[in-house]
């Protein structure tokens, strides 16, 4: 386990990955007097606009990654993306650099095969039935015992890249090709999962502290398209027994991974209403995109919770501020420079907020912002967030 950080302030935090989630982490850290260095593979990443220092490096190059960390010697290294030279983090940790949550946890969770084997085989958590394949023929052979359809994902990818639902043998070749195109790194391996018919997908934001109990945010329901988050709402309605089961599994897996910080732990609820089975899906050792809703729905957002946890600061209470919802704002076209229309229309309703991430360019389906809303109930909150997002248009700058 990495050492707990000291109580000395100000602290220097290095973000490995500087997207919209990293930007909110940077803002939360700066409010506590921290110095932030934002690192990413391209200039103009969202967190770079609010950072004290900026570095642009090939994030999957271990030598470049080690060099930038050694040059700055930050108090904490906080990975915020999955496309990283994760093996370099273990070497840096051995030199006394604190990696959040730990280098080992980061490496395990950035590979679907490692986190799935940990959850299912080692910890005995309920997961979808699964197998691995290293070729199109192997994919077909792995899928047959699971029953069609199956879900195919590269073992290393991010933001839903390379995922597909395979309905039968005729789809295997295209699914294999999509997985190879969307994979991160040089590996070709895919995970083949049974297709779960679930009533609800949730993210349970789980806060592990250096000292003190593991804490949980109210569950977040969410919908995905193309393997990527589209909307979320909090709190998601679920039974007490199901919530307790999810919390127990989240605590078990995060305790095994160790370290401190916020983890986004994903589950499916499957089965008849009132007696659903809770099935572990995935885990991210950092703030989660579905958790953007906490910016309006909680007294402490997931980003504030992450920063407090990694700095060893108190978290007296996590309180819901009411029914909250989010809806992403997507680009529909490619633009080298971007502008937005409809901003005023998006903000006409009370208890509605808009975040535009400041990404320098656009491409179809790229997430450019998010609308947030509070409502009297889940339906109203989701309706307001959907309406606000629908007002936005991403155009050429």
Give the location of each predicted region:
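Active-site "cap" helix and flanking loop/linker of ATP-utilizing ligase/carboxylase catalytic domains
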Residues: 244-265, 284-336
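ATP-binding N-terminal substructure of ATP-dependent carboxylate-amine bond-forming enzymes
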Residues: 1-105, 109-110, 114, 137
